[in-house]
């Protein structure tokens, strides 16, 4: 669940950069267990990165008993605001949300109890947001294990976890649709990220299978609608090593 999120080409304000405005890629990330909150880095080419504000936190976590800000995911919404979600704890039934006009001053942090309706929920990990311009809808999605569900893929070596991707939609971050199962293709899955690509949506995901044959790789699925259904996964796009936390960068030339 270690991941660095939010790569997009944006115009960063003078206050954030400490210099004149500049169009760059921005990288959101956390350090350690996420105790000190949101960190940001910039890049002009998507390959060489410089941390901002001396690699100190832009926002301290306030939610849950653990007060963590892991896996921060930020997008620019249709309203021009920066919208961020994050993992607030290893074991909570919800996620964190905040918004900002400039990445410096943030709204009040809000706990969204996305899995509070379910018994046996173990976690809500690595939430992300994708915006559908056509419908004006935001979809928030994350990985959860529910005790007693998908027992055929429970992994004894990993605390009997068996994750699937769940989601909710909203247009205003005030009211949310009922949580629904977003992705289940018969294996444990975490760390999904979805981008629009023309008339389709592309999901990059981690196959979390450890036994009998370890996968731990990144695969790709496709859907005509943001809410799915998503196709069966591709073959791994990563090599013979364990990978997780994919982030997608669309370069300035659109590739």
Regions found by a protein language model. Give the residues of each.
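Sec-dependent N-terminal signal peptides
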Residues: 4-16
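Carbohydrate-active catalytic/glycan-binding domains of CAZyme proteins
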Residues: 18-255
């Amino acid at each position: 669940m270690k991941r660095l999120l939010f790569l997009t080409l944006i115009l960063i304000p003078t206050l954030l950069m400490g210099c004149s405005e500049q169009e760059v890629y921005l990288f959101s990330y956390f350090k350690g267990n996420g105790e000190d909150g949101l960190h940001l880095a910039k890049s002009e080419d998507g390959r060489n990165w410089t941390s901002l504000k001396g690699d100190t936190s832009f926002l301290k976590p306030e939610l849950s008993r653990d007060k963590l800000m892991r896996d921060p995911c930020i997008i620019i919404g249709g309203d021009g605001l920066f919208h961020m979600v994050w993992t607030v704890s290893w074991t909570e039934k919800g996620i964190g949300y905040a918004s900002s006009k400039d990445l410096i001053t943030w709204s009040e942090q809000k706990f969204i109890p996305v899995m509070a309706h379910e018994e046996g929920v173990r976690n809500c990990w690595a939430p992300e947001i994708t915006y559908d311009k056509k419908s004006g809808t935001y979809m928030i999605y994350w990985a959860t294990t529910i005790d007693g569900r998908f027992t055929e893929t429970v992994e004894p070596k990993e605390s009997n976890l068996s994750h699937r991707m769940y989601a909710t939609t909203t247009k205003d971050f005030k009211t949310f649709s009922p949580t629904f199962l977003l992705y289940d293709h018969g294996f444990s899955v975490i760390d999904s990220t979805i981008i629009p690509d023309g008339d389709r949506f592309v999901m990059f995901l981690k196959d979390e299978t450890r036994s009998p044959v370890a996968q731990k790789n990144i695969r790709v699925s496709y859907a005509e609608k943001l809410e799915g259904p998503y196709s069966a996964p591709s073959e791994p796009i990563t090599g013979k090593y364990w990978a997780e936390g994919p982030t997608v960068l669309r370069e300035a030339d659109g590739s």
